[in-house]
Amino acid sequence: MAQADAPLSIVGAERGWILLLVLAVWSYDTGAYLVGKNFGRTKFLTHISPSKTIEGLVGGVVATTVVVAVMLLGLGQNPLHALILGPLTALAAQAGDLAESVIKRAAGAKDSGTIIPGHGGMLDRVDSFIFAAPVVTLYVLALVR
């Protein structure tokens, strides 16, 4: 399918890639949370973030890869790129979340703010994007376009 004929061509290529990034990170967070909460048994990196599980990590990677594949189809790109871009984006999102946890621990804070009640603060809302955005950008510029 040509890019001009792609279902998401109506939003424009740049907006489509931004939407891919946002949905990929959200799908990682959601997949990791749901799988970790329901099936998580094997804890990892508990000294940084006590609730992280390997099962949650895998669930997040799978969710991200599926969403990235669907988005790539919508953008008129080869969905096989999702086999690389999905896990890379998921792991970058996890790294951003863990980096923010390290900063909070070093500061002796449970949350990074109170502006959004129940969500740990503004930094918790963007931590995954800080690491995932450069990964998606570099991948797309180097290999997709």
What is the role of each PLM region?
Residues 138-145:
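Juxtamembrane boundary at the C-terminal end of a transmembrane helix
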Residues 132-133, 145:
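C-terminal-most transmembrane helix of multi-pass membrane proteins
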